[in-house]
Curated annotation (Swiss-Prot):
The gene is flgI. The lineage of its organism: Bacteria, Pseudomonadati, Pseudomonadota, Gammaproteobacteria, Enterobacterales. Keywords: Bacterial flagellum, Periplasm, Signal. Belongs to the FlgI family. HAMAP family: FlgI (MF_00416). This is Flagellar P-ring protein. The keyword S-adenosyl-L-methionine does not apply. Assembles around the rod to form the L-ring and probably protects the motor/basal body from shearing forces during rotation. GO terms for biological process: bacterial-type flagellum-dependent cell motility. It comes from the Bacteria.
Length: 365
């Protein structure tokens, strides 16, 4: 029996796939989403909006909006609002989007609002990097979190200051596209791989004739195509469903330093090595001792004396042998046998790679 690292060691064990479709391995160069951003106001909050004395931009935005609606707020008016919040609105402009198409938007508080639950986003223009308005957003916000507070205590589940509006924005301006204007199409691999790029080109050449595709580098495969959008759509519809026998992947271990999760693929292998690990813990405990003199008529003074205790413990440290492991199951058994915590495992893997015992690329994100 070996101790399971479930909960902090995530292992993705993939079965051998006979072939993958080109559509799953590549994307079409130039066919992508674009980011949109806007600033707006959320109203209708149940007393959980911005504190306007601490967020003057909320009051300024509200005054500007009211003036556009023909309502003038007297100068010097100190509006104490609790149902309004200033927010940033973001969205992704999909490729080939057409005027009138609805897209989802994400609404995020930028002030000190406690919650956006029950709020309504007022009409907000969404702009691109060229400062042009491409969509208008408005609607009721859906919040995935919940919270309650009373008597100085509070409970909160998930995030309350951010939400989503499904189909909350409408495209008002279309982006020009160069799709169909040239006589070539570039397929971009999801991951750099010279072998896979050559295999994709060979597969396309077998299906459409020699010279139809050529790998430009480890990420790009160029395909000859007829001009015209409809002709290139027909070409891609046939190419993307072709299957490619994927070669052996690079052995790779990914470590997330923030969450402590470790992910490795099936190509990871270990060489024999010995590992010693130890944990050093320091505990500091401080108590206040009150010393009161037993002289009620002598004018004594009560004195508070701090008493500090420091405890230092070191555990572990014994050498443990790690046997050679050629497959993922053996690697899992070898690492589980160490009984290491997630943070220990991160350090052990780094040391193994430095010692030449970990036959894999180590990436820390």
């Amino acid at each position: 029996m070996f101790k399971s690292l479930t909960g902090f060691l995530l292992l993705l064990v993939a079965t051998f796939a006979q072939a993958d479709r080109i559509r799953d391995l590549t994307t079409v160069q130039g066919v992508r989403e674009n980011s949109l951003i806007g600033y707006g106001l959320v109203v209708g909050l149940d007393g959980t909006g911005d504190q306007t004395t601490q967020t003057p931009f909320t009051t300024q935005s509200l005054n500007n909006m009211l003036s556009q609606l023909g309502i003038t707020v007297p100068a010097g008016t100190n509006m104490q609002l609790k149902n309004v919040a200033a927010v940033m609105v973001t969205a992704s402009y999909p490729a080939f989007a057409r005027q009138g198409q609805a897209i989802d938007v994400v609404v995020s508080s930028m002030g000190n609002a406690k919650s956006l639950r029950g709020g309504t986003l007022l009409m907000t223009p969404l702009k691109g990097v060229d400062n042009q308005v491409y969509a208008l957003a408005q609607g009721n916000i859906l919040i995935g979190g919940a919270g309650a507070s009373a008597g100085g205590s509070s409970v909160q589940v998930n995030q309350l200051n951010g939400g989503r509006i499904t189909n909350g924005a409408v495209i008002e301006r279309e982006l020009p596209t160069q799709f169909g204007s040239g006589n070539t199409i570039n397929l971009q691999l999801n991951n750099d791989d010279f072998t896979l790029a050559q295999q994709i080109a060979d597969t396309i050449n077998r299906a459409r004739g020699y010279g139809s595709a050529v790998p430009l580098d480890a990420r790009t495969v160029q395909v000859r195509a007829p001009t015209g959008g409809s002709s290139q759509v027909q070409l891609l519809a046939g190419i993307q469903n072709l299957e490619v026998n994927v070669a052996v992947q690079d052995a790779k271990v990914i470590i997330n330093s923030r969450t402590g999760s470790v992910v490795m693929n099936r190509e990871v292998a270990l060489d024999s090595c010995a590992v010693a690990q130890g944990n050093l813990s320091v505990t500091v405990n401080q108590q206040a001792n009150v010393s009161q003199p037993n002289t009620p008529f002598g004018g004594g003074q009560t004195v508070v004396t701090p008493q500090t205790q420091i405890d230092m413990r070191q555990s572990g440290g014994a050498l443990q042998r790690v046997t050679s492991s050629a497959n993922l199951n053996s690697v899992v058994r070898a690492l589980n046998a160490l009984g290491a915590t997630p943070m220990d495992l991160m350090s052990i893997l780094q040391s193994m790679q430095s010692a030449g015992c970990l036959r894999a690329k180590l990436e820390i994100i």
